[in-house]
Amino acid sequence: MEGEKGSKTRKGDALAREKLLEIAEKIYNQFEEEVVPSVSLPSRTKANLEYSDESDVWVYGDRESERSAKTVKGAFQLLKTTYATDFLINEHLARNRGSTLRELYYISEGWDYAKFKEQGESDRLIEDLEILTSLQREYFHMRPEEDGATMFGPIEITEQTKRGERNIHCQKDVGEGGYQIPFNVENIEFQKHDASMIIAIETGGMYARLMENGFDEAYNAILVHLKGQPARSTRRIIKRMNEELGIPVAVFTDGDPWSYRIYASVAYGAIKSAHLSEFMATPAAKFLGLQPSDIVEYELSTDKLTEQDVSALRSELSDPRFESDYWKEQIQLQLDIGKKAEQQAFAGKGLDFVTEVYLPNRLKEMGMI
């Protein structure tokens, strides 16, 4: 097993090196041919999202933006691209090392004119390299700053670590917080499970409530804490459990426009990382709630929508990820009532209400129980 893992890692490193060298070679050849160096990338805007019938997720369309040395800004971007490419090849891949996104920003301080002005700039460059190579950043040994979230439920896994294999049952062998999802979930193998569903939960409070109330045992549910906008590793493990094990997924968030985007990132992918949608998005994931109609039906405690909330909801009406009749009706209802609610609002009906009344009713309505 360890030999297979090592061989797979070496093949991945060789592929990443080959793809990164192709970028450098293209720029070098443009110089040789006395052509102004440039690279083209998909435009990362909402207007350039297209639905892929093949994969059922939203991906980038044909609109492109050019990074060209014709301008000073473009020349600096290409310079930084070559420095980063050289660093990833010679420091990460050649020496089997890795860095966080934050570390890369600080490492660039030694790159003279290629130094990044802010971390957002270095983050975007790594995303550019993902697009240009058609590889995920993990192939370059780049690690995110944030941890993956946690999960708790009836599934047994094997995780490959630097210290060998770990066999873990995600109910019996973990503490109250659950199993910590690693940043590279390709190191996980699923062994066996008794799960009938996955509930991906936005807030830590609701995740803890479902665990305390025994919802995982009562409904054979794998509970996944999204920790707000989910990390890549969280989205990836949800997709893998859905596709490889056939476990249906429901996403349970707060009832506001920002939370609907959390659902969209799980189901369809995020706008800024649409190049990874086919790898991370779970188009079969269903939106459980909290729905605007739930606010009305259960007379939940609410807050008034802010101007930013209203603007975000109106923006979602033109977002291709929310173009279904269901979403248009729910968003319009929320605009009409002018209210939003948190998951924890169900506590106003009693600590057991969400697990004994709301979730069973909603899951039956969705055909999941």
UniProtKB/Swiss-Prot annotation:
Needed co-factor(s): Mg(2+)
Transmembrane residue ranges: none
EC top class, as a word: isomerase
Domain Topo IIA-type catalytic: 11-149
Pfam families according to UniProt: TOP6A-Spo11_Toprim, Topo_VI_alpha, TP6A_N
Residues annotated as catalytic: Y106 (o-(5'-phospho-dna)-tyrosine intermediate)
EC number(s) per entry: 5.6.2.2
GO molecular function term, any single one: ATP binding
GO biological process terms, semicolon-separated: DNA topological change
Binding-site residues for Mg(2+), renumbered to this chain: E202, D254
Catalyzed reactions: ATP-dependent breakage, passage and rejoining of double-stranded DNA
Alphabetical UniProt keywords: ATP-binding, DNA-binding, Isomerase, Magnesium, Metal-binding, Nucleotide-binding, Topoisomerase
Any Gene Ontology CC annotation: chromosome
Chain's role: Relaxes both positive and negative superturns and exhibits a strong decatenase activity.
Subunit structure: Homodimer. Heterotetramer of two Top6A and two Top6B chains.
Family note: Belongs to the TOP6A family.
Database matches in HAMAP family: Top6A
The protein's name in its UniProt record: Type 2 DNA topoisomerase 6 subunit A
Organism in which the protein naturally occurs: Methanosarcina mazei (strain ATCC BAA-159 / DSM 3647 / Goe1 / Go1 / JCM 11833 / OCM 88)
Taxon lineage: Archaea, Methanobacteriati, Methanobacteriota, Stenosarchaea group, Methanomicrobia
